[in-house]
Amino acid sequence: MNQRQKTSRRAVLKGLGASLALPFLPSLMPKGLLAQSAGATHQAPQRFAALFMPNGVHPGKWSPTKLGRDFELSPILQPLAKVQDKMLVLGGLSNKHSYRTVEGHYTKTGNFLTSMRVSRTVDADVNAGGISVDQVLAKHLGKHSVFPSLQYGLDRMKSGVCKSTGITRLYGSTISWESGRQPCSREIDPRMAFDRLFRDFVPGKKPLPHDPYKQSVLDIVMNDAKRLEKRIGVEDRNKLNEYLTSVRTIEKRLDNQASLKDFEARITPDVRKELQRMDIRIDEWAEFTEGVDITDKARLMVDIIVLAFWSDISRVATYMLGNSASGRNFSFLDGVNDSHHAISHHKYDPRQMAQYEIINRWHIEQYAYLLERLDSIKEGDGTLLDNSMILFGSGLRDGMRHSPKDLPIVVGGSGGGRLHTGSNVRYDADTPLANLYQTMLAATGSEVQGFGDSTGTLSDLLV
């Protein structure tokens, strides 16, 4: 059965070569069900996303100074001001299976969502210890959606062995695991991510004379959208138009991403040959090493996640804003003149630490963008953010010390009112990060017990 045919609770617009899942529209409910639900609140689905930031944080500029609800955001967390009452800053959480090893980055990324011991290996025989929490949630929350989970990133997956640690780089390229030995593949191209959700693929078929892939998805399904508008009420029509406008905006941004031809023209034949040998696209190399501003690309991925949650085509997503030990050049940010990983090894130089803070803040700005977008979309008596749990974190505290203790962790949203929010909470030292994951599982009604190295839930967070 075509995976898209699973969708029944929400409408799908269709056209030749594309389909577009829609948000929940009460006007489309059968009259009998609509009558039964009169006076009752539509039960919105829960969503979960995890955003990963590599290379840790500036330790002195991350944590708010006050605990409880009356806390002031730290300099790095300032971009979250608009959603402060809908988020949690959590301190003291540690990933013990990360610090029982001398490796600095890769194992601390590979087990970020598994909280299990990572096997040291130099080849593709990887083992992250077990399934990641997003995949547990995908089996629970995502079993009724078209795509049980989505995995996105900004950096291409890396293979080979890290010379300084003698461990495979594969661990640094994924946080999502179907099982300990099976990492989930990621999409790093916004166009491919968008098309995978909203275009129909027909393997082995020749392109149609009028290739639908050259058309806007919205243009393809517009006739169906116009027919639907005649069947729904004014409120739902406004909701539909808001959603379709968002789709159109993303398509335009995908088509208008900045050209990298100038960088390509400056690449020497020797470098071009080496890039071909390494099988890396020229524009990708330039983007990573030449300080190209990737903010819009990063936010395109965010907007695609928002569309997926909004339309209920998926309820679970992970998004890596960089691979472990990412050396992306962040000189597109004012005040930064070097690569992320190099700056994270700041040696307590005030100039380096100032740049480190700027890079950290950029990552939080992308997280804040996601939370604000979700919070802007009404759903039932609340918003998409209210019905979500959006994790942000890194696998280590400080890039200089590589410590996976007192990890930088934020959670946005209450999971449909299951979590208390609006506080800065600090737990006893070495409280397992897995206790947060066990808490999130409990908030969704999952019956999974003893996730990772958890010793219980963070019961003070549960409503």
Predicted stretch roles:
Residues 1-463:
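Ligand-binding pockets and gating/stacking loops
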